[in-house]
Amino acid sequence: MTVVTRDKSKIAAGLFLALSTLSTFAAHADQLADIKKAGVVKVATFDSNPPFGSVDAKSHDIVGYDVDFAKALAKTLGVKLQLVPTNPANRIPLLQSGKADLIVADITITPERAKVIDFSVPYFVTGQQFLVPAGSPDKLDAYATARIGAVKGTTGEQELHHRFPQSRVLSYDDIPLALSALRNGNVQAITQDSTILAGLLDGAPDKAKYKVLPELLSKEEIGVGVKKGEASLLKVVNDELLNLEKNGQAVSIYNVWFGPQTKSPQPRLFKIEAK
């Protein structure tokens, strides 16, 4: 009798574990259905990184390149859009904790990040550059031992440690704080995506005192971040991004924020393509 009871206990425990595992998997793997049921998609995006995402001075709404893509994704999902303001260091934690369903916040696709979240096809291609005082050297290697400012949690921060191990990298919560450090002389250069630096410099009252170095620190592809294993949601995101390219809306969004008439004009040298 004792043996039978023990066996029954083992079977019961095994069934409980199996059911728990299935329940957890179902809850994890059905985020698309959860979003549609809730009627809202929560998207982590920047609120201080123009032209990708920043607060409009007149409307006080968050606007930008990323925001327009977030709006398009919400529309194809058939739900309302809830923007969740973030900074580079908080993007992935917000997604993993469930406080955001998607990351549309200028997040670079890297092998390290791909271990913990999934990425869509790239919807933007950029590169890291340096912003320095106008009289500074033009070559990146001249800053090999310099004090360089970067934004926490960005690929630029990581690349600096790899490319210039002798430099002193100072990390900041966002790019405006890094610019303040450059103005104050706390750093000799700051690095960020080329498009963000162009927008930052254009809006600076003292922009004549600074310049963006032409040489790229790195070339980077930007994608939408999705929680690991959410294949159905990822497919919807990818399909919509490819559709936006096909119907010309992706180009229209690009021109609004990076076209010739904008504060940070950049030629569009990429297409959204399946990989």
Name these PLM-found stretches:
Residues 30-106:
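Extracytoplasmic small-molecule ligand-binding "clamshell" domains
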Residues 32, 132-148:
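Flexible hinge/capping segments at coil-to-helix
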Residues 44-49, 84-89, 98, 102-110, ...:
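Beta->alpha turn/N-cap motifs
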Residues 67-76, 136, 145-147, 154-155, ...:
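Extended ligand-binding regions for polar small-molecule ligands
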Residues 75-76, 84-85, 89-102, 116-118, ...:
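Short helices/loops that flank or line small-molecule/ion binding pockets
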Residues 159-172, 241-275:
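Ligand-binding clefts/hinges and TM-proximal coupling segments of bilobed small-molecule sensing domains
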